[in-house]
């Protein structure tokens, strides 16, 4: 059976692993998932990201990050634009997540960017998810 929403699947896997405080998680690779994983690493939500090539599509291995007392760095993930209801925003309409404490993932013509990066480059796009 094919997966109807691979981004929601990725966010659910991260959320579930984070809730039970797993050190790492693995998920099937795709170009958009690689871009999202790199943003999570760059923004400090995950420790590191590895790409493992195999005969099929490859695997993304993400190492989750936790605070000093084993508190979660990722407190919430929410899918915004879904296959049944796409959500688009212009550059000046891009949402701020928790007044800038979180990030919004935006799929643009220049790839997947955070809301801050898209605002700086003055490009809008599809609002994929909120992470805080």
Swiss-Prot record:
UniProtKB keywords: Ribonucleoprotein, Ribosomal protein, RNA-binding, rRNA-binding
Source superkingdom: Bacteria
Subunit architecture: Part of the 30S ribosomal subunit. Contacts proteins S5 and S12.
Family assignment from sequence similarity: Belongs to the universal ribosomal protein uS8 family.
Functional description taken from the UniProt entry: One of the primary rRNA binding proteins, it binds directly to 16S rRNA central domain where it helps coordinate assembly of the platform of the 30S subunit.
Name of this chain's protein: Small ribosomal subunit protein uS8
Keyword Zinc: no
Single biological process term from Gene Ontology: translation
GO cellular component terms listed in the entry, alphabetical order: ribonucleoprotein complex; ribosome
Annotated GO MF terms: rRNA binding; structural constituent of ribosome
HAMAP family for this protein: Ribosomal_uS8_B
Protein source organism: Macrococcus caseolyticus (strain JCSC5402) (Macrococcoides caseolyticum)
